[in-house]
């Protein structure tokens, strides 16, 4: 296709050299100016890093012209899900400034100067702010939007699917048409970008396949410079061309798929044309589009970590100079008579001056507050009349801090802490002592630093889950006993009827109503835009949910079994869990991930790897109900909040009978609040999920031996026991056992740390704490395999009895 651009199923063939653009001379020269500003910014940014003003630099040089062409068709309401090469696009679309470019390099923590992430991410990781300061939605339909970037290659792809699917739902579900601050009836395109090497990742192919199936307005651009750091395309991609191997996805007479466009990264005319043509199809027909932009370059190499001269041949480097996109645009402008060399020279000079000015402004914004902070502290620390032996050491630390030309927070705080250690009680007068003043200053600065660097792991808005109080289920004498799955089904029915933003999806969720019938009949009642099936693609099921939630919907994404969550754990950990944190409260994705887990049958349908999950998804609530009533209450709670959650239904409890609450759909189970299931006085047993019923059996067995056990269902692993109820039980019993079916040292160790260290429960122990867990291996098949792999009531009994024997051997003699 070197001479033509093919648009499948449209019969359009256009010679590249026919320039039909409506862009006038001023627009072309403005594009040239912007390309040069972006290139100079890359060069100057690299210099700032290499001279020590920044820690790391990664840039988008070599990709300027294609990104300018793409920005021309990016509208208010549209969304970007891209990566760290997109600085020119962000500048051209007006979502980013040169001052912000340098503020990112310096790590400026002032949201005014670095609004995308407040200094939490390395440079060229972009985002716009979807939320007001109070955490409420802005009018995102009237602004251009960029979802928050992450570094993992292809990590932007799963969320892109959801951003595009949202447009389809906003268009086809008329109940959503009134939500004009979220969407203009689905007239938005989700733009994705990815490097050619990253298309080798599974996330890319999974997303592309799903987009082709869903037929959604997703436009993905592949920036192809021929390399993945030092690895060339021939070792990355079959046929060395992503468009060639994606040809089977192309829309044609045999069925739906993608429109596929190709162009060269240096061909301004062609790039403007294909983006205008391709995005029009994408927006108007809601069909996905792939733009493969090849013959791009990377003039300064991958990043500031090294030079591409180490792995590119002299011939390749010379080719990159000849085919540099800005040089080619300059040649084209001169050749066509749009402007002469002198005029372009002036544009280039003005661009360089503009970038230098932006750098100076950004640096002053960053360094002045730090210099002031340093000087204020030194002034405070100079107030002393003491002549003790440590004064010289204090003076030395102050001198070293004073001569640092460009101090950072670490320099100042580290010096202050070292000085505090050396201050004696006689320094200054007691009422205004140096120790008191420095301590107060440090406390204030540490609090401020926590706000700057550690806020917004969870929601700070008025809709935070922790603020939602519980409402108990209400029962009457006539409340029927039904299988637990019916409680969930009726609860979902009430949710779908009440909230038009809620959409539920997953494998087998739609037509058959879920593998355990918890959504039975709901697709027929509410339609395929509210509850629907997906393919077997866990990573993009979660990513789909992330993107939908970022656009203001309330998605519920089902992962059929907890064991298969691992396919999507990277998306949860790197994208969903970090979103509010990495944007410092600028974006949110209140996604509910529902799954079923714990013991049932065989290695891959009996998993309970909670420690792996809770330690990788901080930022997501992890809720572990013991039955379907508690699960329903958690769904109701989280749908009132603006935070993401993973809710794990007990896999072996769908057929167990539970009373149907009279207030179905309205009762709420609060997060972070355990429930005491059995009161006792001798020992505390702490567990959750499917283990609760096993523990209840063990409690009955223990009673026969005069042991009174207090059984506590934690219900919520993250957050965990926020009111320290377990500690109060331990104060009474002075003995504790933590029980679950995770691996040894897993979630039981997590719970133990929370109670003994964080809650200071250690001081109330009469004997060592115990854990009862599964074996280190996966659960074997069959009843006996489960019995000898997972902990059972007898294991709990034995652990408790042995502990009681250790405390009082005469009352509890050995029986084992």
Which functions belong to the PLM regions below?
Residues 1-66, 72-73, 299-301, 305-526, ...:
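Conserved acidic/glycine
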Residues 28, 32, 53-54, 75-79, ...:
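Short coil/turn connectors at secondary-structure junctions
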Residues 40-221, 226-228, 232-250, 603-605, ...:
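Cofactor-binding active-site loop characterized by glycine-rich and histidine/acidic residues
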Residues 64-68, 145-406, 412, 503, 651-816, ...:
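Thiamine diphosphate
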Residues 83-84, 154, 193-194, 221-224, ...:
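Short beta-strand segments
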Residues 138-144, 155, 433-473, 618-622, ...:
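Helix-enriched interaction subdomains in cytosolic or periplasmic regions
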Residues 587, 597-601, 605, 610, ...:
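Active-site phosphate/pyrophosphate-binding segments
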